C-alpha cells in the first residue's frame, strides 16, 4: 500500500490542491491527492452493464436558506441504461468516471441537495439507492413499482425534441412531465420512467422540483455499481492507514423517515451536524478541499459535511 501511495502521489501531484489537514488538533500541510483520489482507485466496483447513451438533466429545487430567503439550488445528473437497468446519479461522478480520479469537493451539491445514486431494476425488480448523509454512506432497497401514467394533450419542443405530456402520482407527489418518442427509451431522471419515450422534463405539481433534459450523448459507457470504498485516513502520527467504508443498509421507507426527522428539523439549516458527533471528536480528523467555485468543502472518509444547508425539500413523501 505504501508503494501504491507513492506512485499515486508522483503521477498525480500536478493536480493536487494544498490545504491544512487537521489530525487530533495538529496541522499538516499535505497534498489532497493522498486521499481524494482513493475512492476511484480502491472502491470495490462491478460493471453491471454498458450504456449506449447518456442523458444529462438539470435538476432545480426551490427552497429557502437559513434566513428564510427563497433560493433555487441547481445541479446536473446523468442517466444511463442497459438491459433494463437504469442508473441516475450526480453528473460529477459520471464525469470523474470518464476522466478518472475523484474529487470529494465535487460531491458537495449532491450532498447539499440530497441527491443519491439510483439503480432502477438492480437487482431485478428492485430499486437500490446509495446516498451520503453525514457521517455515513447509506444504501436502501425498495420494490420497483409500476408508475401509472395518464397521457395528456400537451405538446412542446424541449432540447430540440417534439414532446408530449403525461402525469402520474408517485410516492406522494404528482408529476407533470414531457417525453419524446424520438428517443425510444422508457427512462427518465431520478426514479421516473415507464413512458413510451425518454422523459425530457418533469415538474412536481407544487413547482418545487424540476428536471430538464440538458444533453444527450450517444456513447458506450460502463454502468458502475460500487459495493464499498476503502479510504486512506491519517493515523495521527503523520502516516496513513486504510479503512474500509461500508454502506449502512436500510429499508427505503426507514431511510426516508430518518431523513425527514433529521433534515426536516428546524435546527438543520443552522447547524447541519446537530444530530451527529462533532467530526473532530468522533473521527479525529477532517479532510479539506475546494470545489471549482473556490468554496472550501469538509468531509470525513469521503462523506461531505454540508456547510451551507438549505431547507430540506423531499422528492418523495412516502
Stretch-by-stretch model annotation:
Residues 14, 21, 88-89, 194-197:
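Glycine-centered flexibility motif
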Residues 1, 20-22, 46, 65, ...:
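Generic detector of intrinsically disordered, low-complexity, polar/charged segments
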Residues 6, 17, 57, 166-168:
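Short beta-strand element of the conserved SAM-dependent methyltransferase core
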Residues 1-50:
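Bacterial Sec-dependent N-terminal signal peptides
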Residues 153-158, 162-219:
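Glycine- and acidic-residue-rich phosphate-binding/metal-coordinating active-site segment common to enzymes
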Residues 2-3, 147, 173, 188, ...:
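Short, low-complexity intrinsically disordered segments
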Amino acid at each position: 500500500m505504501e508503494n501504491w501511495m507513492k506512485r499515486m502521489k508522483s503521477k498525480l501531484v500536478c493536480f493536487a490542491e494544498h490545504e491544512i489537514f487537521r489530525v487530533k488538533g495538529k496541522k499538516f500541510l499535505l497534498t489532497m491527492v493522498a486521499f481524494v483520489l482513493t475512492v476511484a482507485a480502491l472502491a470495490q466496483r462491478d460493471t453491471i452493464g454498458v450504456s449506449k447513451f447518456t442523458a444529462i438533466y438539470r435538476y432545480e429545487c426551490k427552497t429557502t436558506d437559513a434566513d428564510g430567503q427563497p433560493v433555487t439550488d441547481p445541479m446536473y445528473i446523468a442517466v444511463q441504461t442497459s438491459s433494463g437497468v437504469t442508473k441516475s446519479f450526480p453528473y460529477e461522478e459520471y464525469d470523474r468516471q470518464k476522466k478518472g480520479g475523484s474529487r470529494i469537493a465535487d460531491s458537495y451539491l449532491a450532498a447539499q441537495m440530497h441527491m443519491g445514486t439510483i439503480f432502477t431494476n438492480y437487482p431485478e425488480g428492485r430499486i437500490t439507492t446509495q446516498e451520503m448523509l453525514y457521517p455515513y454512506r447509506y444504501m436502501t432497497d425498495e420494490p420497483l413499482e409500476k408508475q401509472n401514467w395518464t397521457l395528456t394533450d400537451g405538446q412542446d419542443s424541449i432540447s430540440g425534441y417534439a414532446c408530449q405530456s403525461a402525469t402520474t402520482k408517485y410516492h406522494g407527489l404528482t408529476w407533470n412531465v414531457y417525453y419524446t418518442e424520438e428517443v425510444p427509451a422508457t427512462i427518465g431522471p431520478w426514479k421516473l420512467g415507464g413512458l413510451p419515450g425518454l422523459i425530457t422534463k418533469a415538474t412536481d405539481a407544487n413547482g418545487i422540483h424540476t428536471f430538464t433534459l440538458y444533453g444527450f450523448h450517444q456513447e458506450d459507457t460502463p454502468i458502475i455499481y460500487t459495493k464499498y470504498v476503502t479510504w486512506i485516513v491519517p493515523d495521527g502520527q503523520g502516516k496513513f492507514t486504510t479503512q474500509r467504508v461500508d454502506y449502512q443498509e436500510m429499508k427505503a421507507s426507514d431511510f426516508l423517515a430518518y431523513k425527514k426527522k433529521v433534515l426536516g428539523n428546524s435546527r438543520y439549516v443552522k447547524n447541519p451536524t446537530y444530530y451527529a458527533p462533532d467530526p473532530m471528536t468522533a473521527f479525529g480528523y477532517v479532510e479539506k478541499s475546494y470545489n471549482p467555485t473556490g468554496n472550501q468543502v469538509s468531509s470525513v472518509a469521503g462523506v461531505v459535511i454540508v456547510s451551507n444547508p438549505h431547507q430540506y425539500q423531499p422528492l418523495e413523501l412516502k
